[in-house]
Amino acid sequence: MSETLVVKIGTSSLTNPHHPGLALSTIAGLVEVICQLRRQGYNVVLVSSGAVGVGCTRLGLRDRPSRIAQRQAIAAVGQGRLMRTYDDLFTTLGQPIAQVLLTRGDLAQRQRYINAYQTFQELFELGVVPIVNENDTVAVEELKFGDNDTLSALVASLVEAQWLFLLTDVDRLYTADPRQDPNAKPITIVHDLSELESIQAGGQGSRWGTGGMATKLTAAKIATQASVRTVITQGRSPENLLKILAGEAIGTWFEPQPETVNARKRWIAHGLVPTGKLLLDAGAVQAIQAGGKSLLAAGIQAIEGDFEAQDAVQLCDLNGTEIARGLVNYDSHELQQIRGCQSDQIVQILGYEGAETIVHRDNLVLS
C-alpha cells in the first residue's frame, strides 16, 4: 500500500520577501519534488497557504487586512490565481491536481468527515494531487482552523498519512527564535512534545501569514497523536523532502506516538470544536485517566458553556487543565441540575430516564 504524505507550505515560503508576488522558483521547485514523489509511488496532499497574500498583491494592498469580511473577500480573489499558478506548473509535468477547500464544519460533522476521507481516497486512486486550503470565503470565525498548520495536521489524521511536512521560513525548530537570539540552539528530534514545554516558540506568523512556530507545535501534537511522523524544515529548499525520505537528518523530526485510539476517537479529539467544559473532582479524573472509565454525574463539580446533547466538551480537573474530550449525553441546562448526583437520581430530577453516563468511555478520548 502506498504511503501518504501531507506537505504544508506557508505564505512566507510562497511569497517574495522583498517585492510583491509569488516566489515562483520556490513553487516550481516544490511542484517538481511532488511530481518526483508521485513517480516514486507516494500519495501526496499539498496544503497551501497564500490566497490572502496573492489577493492583496492583485489588489495592490500593502498590508494584510484586519477585518474578517475583507480578508475573506481578498482570499476569494487570491485563491483562483494561486490555483492557476499551481495548475500551470503541474500540467507542464503531466500531473493532474484537484482543489479541495475545507472548513472546520466539514470535519466537525461525522458524515461530512467520512465523505471527505472517501473523496481523498478516490483522488489518490485517480493519481491526483489534492491541493487543500481553508475555505476562507465562507468560514465562520468560531469554526475556523485558524491557520493552515492546524489544517494540515487534521488532514494528515483524516487521510491516515505516514508523514506531515511543515515547510516554513526557518530550517528547523530552535530553543528560541534564531533571528532574535544568537544563543538559540537547533532541535533535531523530539520524542515527546512535553520536552518542549520550556521552549519559547513565539506566537506570531509572518507579515502575510497566520502561523508562527507555536501553531506548528500544535500541529505536531495533533499529527503525532495520530501516528504521523512530522518534520519542520525550510520551505525554500523543497528538495529536502526527498533527502528526508531517504533518511537524511534534516529539520526537526517529531516522532509519532503509538496509535492508541481508532479513527472515530481521533475525530472526537481533533475534528470537533468543544462547546463547553466540565470540571471534575479528583476521583473522576483518576477514574478516567487511569481506569478508562466513563464520566458519571457524581464526578462533575462545575459546568462552563452552553451546549446541546452530543456536542463535544472538554473534561478538566479543578485547575482547568484538560484531561480528555468527549461527546456529552445531556445538554448544559440538564447537567446543571444533575451534576454531583448519583446516576439513579437522574430520573427523579429530570423526570425521564436518560443515559446513566454523562460521557461514555466509547465517546471519550484522553488529551
UniProtKB/Swiss-Prot annotation:
Catalytic activity: L-glutamate + ATP = L-glutamyl 5-phosphate + ADP
Pathways involved: Amino-acid biosynthesis; L-proline biosynthesis; L-glutamate 5-semialdehyde from L-glutamate: step 1/2
Alphabetically ordered keywords of this record: Amino-acid biosynthesis, ATP-binding, Cytoplasm, Kinase, Nucleotide-binding, Proline biosynthesis, Transferase
Domain PUA positions: 275-353
Compartments it resides in: Cytoplasm
GO MF annotations, alphabetized: ATP binding; glutamate 5-kinase activity; RNA binding
GO biological process: L-proline biosynthetic process
Its biological purpose: Catalyzes the transfer of a phosphate group to glutamate to form L-glutamate 5-phosphate.
Annotated family: Belongs to the glutamate 5-kinase family.
Protein's recorded name: Glutamate 5-kinase
Organism, scientific name: Synechococcus elongatus (strain ATCC 33912 / PCC 7942 / FACHB-805) (Anacystis nidulans R2)
